[in-house]
């Protein structure tokens, strides 16, 4: 089941909690993507240097597999890594579209 979330609320909570909500959001989205067929490893890798880069790649790979089939996982990984502030907007927008379709 995909949860529709407000982008404004996502960013406001992320700012107010000094980024902690973004980590919570990543955990929730990872669970949703995995339930839809992605294979994203445990979020504990987020707190381990270097392993967090691997985790982000696997997240991008899962995002592409579930929501953007046929597109490049490497492109999304680089986008998420280099311009990380827009990553939640991209991912949540796609999840919201899926939720509206009933996915």
Swiss-Prot record:
Annotated TM spans: 10-28, 35-57, 72-91
Principal cellular location given in the protein's record: membrane
Any coiled-coil regions, as ranges: none
GO CC, alphabetical: plasma membrane
Any one Pfam family match given in the protein's UniProt record, by short name: DUF4234
Compartments, as annotated in UniProt: Cell membrane
The entry's keywords: Cell membrane, Membrane, Transmembrane, Transmembrane helix
InterPro entries the UniProt entry points to: DUF4234
Membrane topology, from the record: Multi-pass membrane protein
Name of the protein described by the UniProt record: Uncharacterized protein AF_1598
């Amino acid at each position: 089941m995909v949860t529709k979330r407000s982008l404004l609320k996502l960013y406001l909570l992320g700012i107010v909690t000094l980024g902690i909500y973004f980590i919570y959001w990543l955990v929730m989205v990872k669970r949703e993507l995995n339930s839809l067929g992605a294979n994203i490893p445990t979020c504990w890798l987020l707190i381990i240097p270097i392993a967090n880069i691997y985790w982000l790649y696997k997240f991008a790979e899962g995002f592409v597999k579930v929501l953007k089939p046929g597109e490049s996982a490497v492109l999304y990984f680089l986008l998420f890594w280099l311009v990380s502030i827009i990553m939640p907007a991209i991912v949540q927008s796609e999840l919201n579209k899926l939720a509206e379709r009933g996915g």
